[in-house]
Amino acid sequence: MATFVSELEAAKKNLSEALGDNVKQYWANLKLWFKQKISKEEFDLEAHRLLTQDNVHSHNDFLLAILTRCQILVSTPEGAGSLPWTGGSAAKPGKPKGKKKLSSVRQKFDHRFQPQNPLSGAQQFVAKDPQDDDDLKLCSHTMMLPTRGQLEGRMIVTAYEHGLDNVTEEAVSAVVYAVENHLKDILSSVVSRRKAYRLRDGHFKYAFGSNVTPQPYLKNSVVAYNSLIESPPALSAPFAGQNPASHPPPDDAEQQAALLLACSGDTLPASLPPVNMYDLFEALQVHREVIPTHTVYALNIERIIMKLWHPNHEELQQDKVHRQRLAAKEGLLFC
């Protein structure tokens, strides 16, 4: 692991020295490429414009090092992540620099300007199924959590923008756990607005959607509901082999469940439709503390509002006419 880190830092240092005053523009283009705002070819063209002919290899070396760092835990084929360039490339070990290399570059340069059919190198258009497109790596496209390699790549780019040299494995693990817990908080806030739940220690929510609800017309129901033994009392000196946070005995738990069932209502709550954007919008408005950052909160609320939809009067009228026609057609068939 230390070898990959040293290679990445060395490649970054060489690239920064080759770029000079253009290093900020290069980091901005790299961030756009990671966000898929620009394509790989456009990023290469901008990098070649900022670098000289002799320093283009530092661009390839840096990208190869950063992709290798992000894919350490994944087995990749040899040479993955290398960016092709028809000009100068990094000097290979065992091959000394000399006039032979310069002459080959001149030959390639002259060969590029030989007349040929421009359509011969055009890429043929092949229709692809959107589900089989593997180039989309954004979470909004894949509908999945970002992988560890994707988070590490984004963190490395952000660290370079703020003048940092590297990202540790502990920082990546902390961000992974933070993303998971953040999504759990959002889901808990949405479900708690739709289903009943119980509290433990005054703040921990559990037993979502429980059918056992207190009967308001029975005096003992509220008492039985509020006097549950949620955790055993803390022992000053637990015995050997005894877990101080163990559950209540099975007999006590069975008696509590029977008492709650006897004191609960007779009717079960009606089934709810699937969670939609309106439920998420209401949950974020009520539980404002789920997204404490105002900038992130305002941006996501705006996105949710843009995706809200409900039928207007014309659509409702058309649906009514359509149902009447279907009913009339079914009546004619029965006759």
UniProtKB/Swiss-Prot annotation:
Q: Which GO terms describe its cellular component?
A: cytosol; focal adhesion; nucleoplasm; SAGA complex
GO molecular function terms attached to this record = transcription coactivator activity
Give the residues annotated as coiled coil.
Answer: none
Question: Alphabetically, which GO biological process terms does the record hold?
Answer: regulation of transcription by RNA polymerase II
Q: Indicate what this protein is called per its UniProt record.
A: Transcriptional adapter 1
Q: Tell me which UniProt keywords the record has, alphabetically.
A: Nucleus, Transcription, Transcription regulation
The family assignment reads: Belongs to the TADA1 family.
Keyword DNA-binding assigned: no
The entry's function note states: Probably involved in transcriptional regulation.
What is the annotated quaternary arrangement, including any partners? Component of the STAGA transcription coactivator-HAT complex, at least composed of SUPT3H, GCN5L2, TAF5L, TAF6L, SUPT7L, TADA3L, TAD1L, TAF10, TAF12, TRRAP and TAF9.
Q: Where does it live in the cell? A: Nucleus
Q: Does the keyword Plastid apply?
A: no
Xref: InterPro entries: Hfi1/Tada1
CDD domains per record: HFD_TADA1
